[in-house]
C-alpha cells in the first residue's frame, strides 16, 4: 500500500483495486491549511461520512464506500483521476465539485454583497438577509483541481467534465435527493442542513457514483434550528473557523492579495482555546448528525 495523495484533510493510499483514506486532524479554510491540528477531527470526518455512505447506499444511491477499517480509516472503490477527460469515457472521478445551497450563506452571500451574483439569479426579488431560506435550492459547480475553486457556468462545467446535459441533470437530481434525506435525518436532532458539497464519479455505464466524503462538519453547513427559529444563526460546522478568520481580517487580506495576483499571506494558527472549541464541535457534531454516541 503506497501513499498517492496528501490532501488538505486526508491521505490517500493505493491498495490494489481499492483506495484507503486516512483522515488527519488537519484543518483548512479558504484553500489554506491552518498550522494547528484539531483533536478528534479525523475520527469525526471518517465516522460521519461512513454513516452517510451506508445511509444512502441502503436507499439505493450508488457510492464508492466499502468499509471502515478503523475510526480514522476507510476503504473505497477506486476510480480513475485523468489529467484530461476523454469524451465518452467512464470509470473516472468528475473534476468538479457540486454545491447545493438551501439558505443564503457563505460565499453566496459574499457574491451577493459584491454584486457578482444578483438576487434574481437565485430566485429572489429583494436583497436577502444572511441566513434567509431560498425559494428553491441553488445548485452550483466549481473547479476541483485548480489552486482555488472557481465557480463555473454550465457550459464550461460540461466541457471540463465530459458530461452531457442529461448526465448533469441526473447528477443534480441525485444530489438534491440526498439533501432531502439529509434534511429529514438531521432535522430529527434539531439541525438545519444549510448547504453542502459533493463529488461524483461516473461508473462503468456512466452512472453517477457519490465519492470522496460528504455530510460532515467539514463539507456541509449546519445550524441550530431552535436558534434559527428565534432569529439567530449558530454555526455548527467548520464555518465557525471561517468566521474566526473573517473576524481577524485575515480573510479580507487573503482575498485582496488573490484579486491583485500578489503573494498570499500565511494563515496564522488558531489560538489554543479556539482549537479546543473546534475539537469539541467535531465530536459533538458526529453525534448530532448521526444520532450515534461517540
Swiss-Prot record:
It holds the Pfam family SAICAR_synt. The keyword Repeat does not apply. The keyword Calcium does not apply. GO terms for molecular function: ATP binding; phosphoribosylaminoimidazolesuccinocarboxamide synthase activity. Pathway: Purine metabolism; IMP biosynthesis via de novo pathway; 5-amino-1-(5-phospho-D-ribosyl)imidazole-4-carboxamide from 5-amino-1-(5-phospho-D-ribosyl)imidazole-4-carboxylate: step 1/2. GO terms for biological process: 'de novo' IMP biosynthetic process. Its EC number is 6.3.2.6. This is Phosphoribosylaminoimidazole-succinocarboxamide synthase. The gene is purC.
